[in-house]
UniProtKB/Swiss-Prot annotation:
Subcellular location: Zymogen granule membrane; Zymogen granule lumen
Stated induction or repression of this protein's expression: Down-regulated in small intestine upon fasting.
Protein name as catalogued: Syncollin
Segment forming the signal sequence: 1-21
Entry-linked InterPro entries: Syncollin
Annotated keywords: Cytoplasmic vesicle, Disulfide bond, Exocytosis, Membrane, Signal
Post-translational changes noted in the entry: Contains intrachain disulfide bonds.
Any one cellular-component term (Gene Ontology): zymogen granule membrane
Organism this protein belongs to: Rattus norvegicus
Expressed in which tissues: Specifically expressed in pancreas and also detected in secretory granules of parotid gland (at protein level). Expressed in pancreas, spleen, small intestine, lung and neutrophilic granulocytes (at protein level). Expressed by epithelial cells in duodenum and colon.
Other remarks in the entry: Syncollin comes from the Greek word meaning to glue together.
Function noted in UniProt: Functions in exocytosis in pancreatic acinar cells regulating the fusion of zymogen granules with each other. May have a pore-forming activity on membranes and regulate exocytosis in other exocrine tissues.
Membrane-topology descriptor: Peripheral membrane protein
UniProt cross-references to Pfam families, sorted A to Z: Syncollin
Amino acid sequence: MSPLCLLLLALALVAVPGARGACPVPADLKKSDGTRTCARLYENSDPYYDNCCQGPELSVDPGTDLPYLPSDWSNSASSLVVAQRCELTVWSLPGKRGKTRKFSTGSYPRLEEYRKGIFGTWAKSISGLYCKCY
């Protein structure tokens, strides 16, 4: 393999971890007392991954069922992280109505990249949620 190919491969491998941006690793989602957190939603997103998962945050405990998000969080989440062995189900309308999507373990720094139907995205579109862990 040529040195140029090796260099390009090395650069590609180094760039992959940055795709998570500033989001925490799913295994690190814990409260200060060490108890488990199911998911964490963030209000601010950015075209640059390094600036995502910042600003106000909403931590969701395992088993949380919120058909109506608090008024300051309804349709405002633009990044989220789901803890290990957990799943977050979201709805686009209050009362668990409208479009739905399940997010499994992982970091989702830009919800603009996840389609909600033909014309929309999940950025600033979450009005209800249910989070469960296994």
